[in-house]
Amino acid sequence: MQKASTSAGAKTAGNRKMQKSPNNGAAKAQKSAKTVDTVTDSELLYNPPAFLTAAEKERRKYLQARVRAEGESASTSSKSNATRPTDRKRHLQAEDPLPADANNNDTNKGGKVAQESASTQAAGTTKRKQPRSQGLEQTSPIMVNGEALACPLVRKSLPAAEAAKSCPLPSKKDSVTKSPMTVHEAPKVDSATSNSNEKQLATMPVDIHKTDSIEEGRRVLEWLINPVAVNQFFADFWENNACVVQRKNPNYYSKLMSFKMIDDILMRNRVEFGTNLDVTIYRNGKRETLNPEGRAFPSVVWDFYAEGCSIRILNPSTYLLGLRQVCSIMQEFFHCLVGANVYLTPPNSQGFAPHYDDIEAFVIQVEGRKRWRLYEPPEKADQLSRTSSGNYDQKQLGEPIIDEVLEAGDLLYFPRGTVHQAITEKGHFSLHITLSVYQQQAYANLLETLMPIVLKKAVKKSVALRRGLPLHTFHVLGEVQRTNRCESRDQLVENVQKLVSKYLMPSTQDIDEAVDQLAKKFQHEALPPIILPEEKVRTVFGSRSISDQEGNSVCDYEFDTDTSVRLLRANILRLVNEDDGSVKIYHHVNNALEYCKYEPNFLEILQEEAIAVEVLISAYPYYITVDQLPLKTVARKVEVATALWEHGLLMTEKPFK
């Protein structure tokens, strides 16, 4: 196996330490001296004092043991007693206040999941049905001992969101007339239940280099859809029903994006119209795209915005580290590319015509507010559609199944094939992010890859499939001949059906091969991993060569049989046996931030070396020593481990220096 040179240009993300909030600091200043001197659990974990009492040392050991525990789920202990809903009219709200999150939100200033009171509902509309309690299980943000440690992302990566002076943040939500819909509420949680549930909540990992990337992706999804439990989300909503989460917590997603960040992106980067940014408007019942040619300078973009046009950034994760981290971590959980678009809409405007998409959509309202209306797919064949639709006219749409206003901190999920449109209200702009998941991930995509494989193998094995068609085939089969009922036609149809049933049943090996091809496609599409500081010192991304007195290059690493290694991520590579007999490792370590900008990255290895990669895949997330690689010689074991590490695919348990 040939060694690779050290990868250049690898960027690192911030660490996972807590940031101190000005709000939290002010709150602490108002406490008594006794309260100030008390060391919190968060401080014990991440910023312990120089001198600890015996009790504090024991408490710190206990907390460290808790956060290291693997397999801890974020679900609550109580089960939902409600039956599974069958309609698509979903609206999740919770009543109890949640602790402050990573965005430094004060619990006394809107750190709650929003719930409309009965009086507000009555004032909004008399048509709306009274809510029915569904008995949803409630989860909380990432916590330790009741303190929310935050959005599970790298801190210090982005500044706090700021609203543009011309577009102040909207006031509190006022009454909005809505279509009648069933509201499913989260039940109140008493203090006893809340305390018991805290033991099961996911916590901020301490040993970053030992975490499971799939579980990290699940943890980010949990934060995204909180207070809906992940298991409940997949049981009740995923690919079936829309879900609305309202929080009255405008800062919940503020670390990801802001109005000001858009201006910074335009100023600091060469953003191209049509490639990176679209200017759209919906007027007279039609959507118009108004992209000029060339670079999207800030002054030009804001002129369009001032005229009522919507701004869509097509690849925001290229420019925003925090958003990129959300996408790159979630793609580990979903095993597919997680894309993102940013939409900025001026007041009293609509940028897009009603349509449906071919993705599972998570709409994250970051700033402002926007009214969303969702409709059933026009045709049954449009449900879970594999392609996006054209634009619909308002006359083609029926009554909306959901008509809701999203405010900053709210979230809306809806399945692919759901017709939707959104409009801002007078006096209120909107900034939201749409995360797109599960595009072209259906069984149909697997079968499209699988059946050619099956047919190719069957043709080689079966003479019957290679025999020529009868001479009269064109005269008895075809669209024109469909009303022609004759014995020869029926016999030909029966022959084709028998050939399919006899020779085209896929084997397990065929299915494995097809799935490998889909996974290879994911490696080409995926975002590159963000390497954290704890990972950088254990990977090639932190390696630096030096020169000795004679000018020779000296590496700062050296593998031996006792070196412990593991894969960088659970899905960082795919081992594929190609048709020509070669064995290749496809990976996304060096992928571009732009979609499929480069050709797929791969390493070609020897057939006898594949078993070593298989062992590494099976061992993840645990470390194994180089000596445990099932290769014949020690030299080959060290060579293979070194080569994989030099390509950025492996991480050592301990830094070399």
From Swiss-Prot:
<dbReference type="GO" id="GO:0034647">
    <property type="term" value="F:histone H3K4me/H3K4me2/H3K4me3 demethylase activity"/>
</dbReference>
<keyword id="KW-0156">Chromatin regulator</keyword>
<feature type="compositionally biased region" description="Polar residues">
    <location>
        <begin position="132"/>
        <end position="141"/>
    </location>
</feature>
<dbReference type="Pfam" id="PF08007">
    <property type="entry name" value="JmjC_2"/>
</dbReference>
<keyword id="KW-0804">Transcription</keyword>
<dbReference type="InterPro" id="IPR039994">
    <property type="entry name" value="NO66-like"/>
</dbReference>
<feature type="compositionally biased region" description="Polar residues">
    <location>
        <begin position="32"/>
        <end position="41"/>
    </location>
</feature>
<keyword id="KW-0805">Transcription regulation</keyword>
<dbReference type="GO" id="GO:0045892">
    <property type="term" value="P:negative regulation of DNA-templated transcription"/>
</dbReference>
<keyword id="KW-0223">Dioxygenase</keyword>
<feature type="region of interest" description="Disordered">
    <location>
        <begin position="1"/>
        <end position="141"/>
    </location>
</feature>
<dbReference type="InterPro" id="IPR003347">
    <property type="entry name" value="JmjC_dom"/>
</dbReference>
<dbReference type="GO" id="GO:0048149">
    <property type="term" value="P:behavioral response to ethanol"/>
</dbReference>
<dbReference type="GO" id="GO:0051864">
    <property type="term" value="F:histone H3K36 demethylase activity"/>
</dbReference>
<dbReference type="GO" id="GO:0048512">
    <property type="term" value="P:circadian behavior"/>
</dbReference>
<dbReference type="GO" id="GO:0016706">
    <property type="term" value="F:2-oxoglutarate-dependent dioxygenase activity"/>
</dbReference>
<feature type="compositionally biased region" description="Polar residues">
    <location>
        <begin position="73"/>
        <end position="84"/>
    </location>
</feature>
<feature type="domain" description="JmjC">
    <location>
        <begin position="315"/>
        <end position="454"/>
    </location>
</feature>
<dbReference type="GO" id="GO:0005634">
    <property type="term" value="C:nucleus"/>
</dbReference>
<keyword id="KW-0560">Oxidoreductase</keyword>
<dbReference type="InterPro" id="IPR049043">
    <property type="entry name" value="RIOX1/NO66-like_C_WH"/>
</dbReference>
<dbReference type="Pfam" id="PF21233">
    <property type="entry name" value="RIOX1_C_WH"/>
</dbReference>
<protein>
    <recommendedName>
        <fullName>Bifunctional lysine-specific demethylase and histidyl-hydroxylase NO66</fullName>
        <ecNumber>1.14.11.-</ecNumber>
        <ecNumber>1.14.11.27</ecNumber>
    </recommendedName>
</protein>
<keyword id="KW-0678">Repressor</keyword>
<feature type="modified residue" description="Phosphoserine">
    <location>
        <position position="140"/>
    </location>
</feature>
<feature type="binding site">
    <location>
        <position position="355"/>
    </location>
    <ligand>
        <name>Fe cation</name>
    </ligand>
</feature>
<keyword id="KW-0479">Metal-binding</keyword>
<feature type="compositionally biased region" description="Basic and acidic residues">
    <location>
        <begin position="55"/>
        <end position="71"/>
    </location>
</feature>
<dbReference type="GO" id="GO:0140680">
    <property type="term" value="F:histone H3K36me/H3K36me2 demethylase activity"/>
</dbReference>
<comment type="function">
    <text>Oxygenase that can act as both a histone lysine demethylase and a ribosomal histidine hydroxylase. Specifically demethylates 'Lys-4' (H3K4me) and 'Lys-36' (H3K36me) of histone H3, thereby playing a central role in histone code.</text>
</comment>
<dbReference type="GO" id="GO:0005730">
    <property type="term" value="C:nucleolus"/>
</dbReference>
<feature type="modified residue" description="Phosphothreonine">
    <location>
        <position position="139"/>
    </location>
</feature>
<keyword id="KW-0597">Phosphoprotein</keyword>
<keyword id="KW-0408">Iron</keyword>
<dbReference type="GO" id="GO:0005506">
    <property type="term" value="F:iron ion binding"/>
</dbReference>
<keyword id="KW-0539">Nucleus</keyword>
<feature type="binding site">
    <location>
        <position position="357"/>
    </location>
    <ligand>
        <name>Fe cation</name>
    </ligand>
</feature>
<feature type="modified residue" description="Phosphoserine">
    <location>
        <position position="133"/>
    </location>
</feature>
<comment type="similarity">
    <text>Belongs to the ROX family. NO66 subfamily.</text>
</comment>
<feature type="region of interest" description="Disordered">
    <location>
        <begin position="165"/>
        <end position="198"/>
    </location>
</feature>
<feature type="binding site">
    <location>
        <position position="420"/>
    </location>
    <ligand>
        <name>Fe cation</name>
    </ligand>
</feature>
